[in-house]
């Protein structure tokens, strides 16, 4: 039901495009996590790779790099690590990551404190693992998946690959504040500090 020609542009570029009605019957909810959850439901390969749509620095080989660590059978999640550009400078981006996600993860999940880009949108999951996890509705989805994989499989099941410098649209603070609130809520919820956040249930057993 795209109104901005996203589906048509993707199909023209050679992507397989499926309507949500053909994947799951539930009425779609707004939010990034909803799209990723449905993507997992539609996937048929052993590995599912996610790449943010506003990425301006995608390079050939990026998807391959994200999947290579899965030669180790213990690896369940692969996160990209990179430098975040900001206003023309090679570093300084990722403000929600640096000011919200990382401090909270170090406080409540110190075993994840070394993860370079906990909120990064470029990552890969084993499909069987993804189907066993809930997906937070909105921008907290990456934090939720990171914590859930670590709790189920251990932090050693999370690998990182260096993808250089990431360039994408830098949002104004007025847009980042709600994102930071959702990310903080997800981490605090997983830590048992506050109640549950809105999320889709695991797909295992549903399809």
How should these model regions be labeled?
Residues 1-8:
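A conserved acidic beta->alpha catalytic loop
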Residues 12-14, 44:
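Short, structured coil segments at secondary-structure junctions
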Residues 26-38, 58-129:
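Acceptor/aglycone-binding surface of glycosyltransferases and processive sugar-polymer synthases
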Residues 45, 73-76, 155:
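Short, high-confidence coil segments that cap the C-terminus of an alpha-helix
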Residues 48:
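Short aromatic/hydrophobic "clamp" motif used to bind/position activated sugar donors
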Residues 51-54:
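Active-site acidic Asp-centered loop
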Residues 92-186:
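Conserved catalytic loops of nucleotide-sugar-dependent glycosyltransferases that act on lipid-linked
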Residues 171-207:
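Terminal low-complexity segments of carbohydrate-biosynthetic enzymes
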């Amino acid at each position: 039901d795209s109104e901005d020609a996203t589906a048509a542009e993707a199909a023209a570029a050679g992507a397989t495009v499926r309507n949500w009605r053909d994947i799951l019957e539930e009425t779609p909810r707004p939010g990034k996590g909803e799209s990723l959850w449905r993507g997992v439901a539609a996937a048929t390969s052993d590995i599912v790779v996610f790449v943010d749509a506003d990425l301006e620095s995608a390079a050939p080989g990026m998807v391959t790099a994200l999947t290579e660590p899965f030669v180790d059978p213990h690896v369940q999640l692969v996160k990209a690590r990179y430098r975040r550009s900001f206003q023309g400078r090679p570093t300084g981006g990722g403000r929600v990551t640096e000011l919200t996600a990382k401090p909270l993860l170090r406080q409540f999940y110190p075993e994840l404190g070394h993860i370079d880009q906990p909120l990064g949108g470029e990552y890969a999951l084993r499909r069987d693992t993804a189907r066993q996890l809930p997906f937070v509705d909105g921008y907290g989805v990456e934090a939720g998946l990171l914590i859930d994989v670590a709790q189920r499989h251990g932090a050693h099941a999370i690998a990182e690959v260096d993808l250089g410098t990431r360039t994408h649209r830098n949002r104004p603070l007025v847009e980042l504040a709600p994102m930071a609130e959702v990310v903080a809520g997800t981490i605090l919820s997983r830590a048992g500090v506050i109640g549950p956040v809105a999320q889709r249930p695991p797909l295992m057993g549903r399809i």
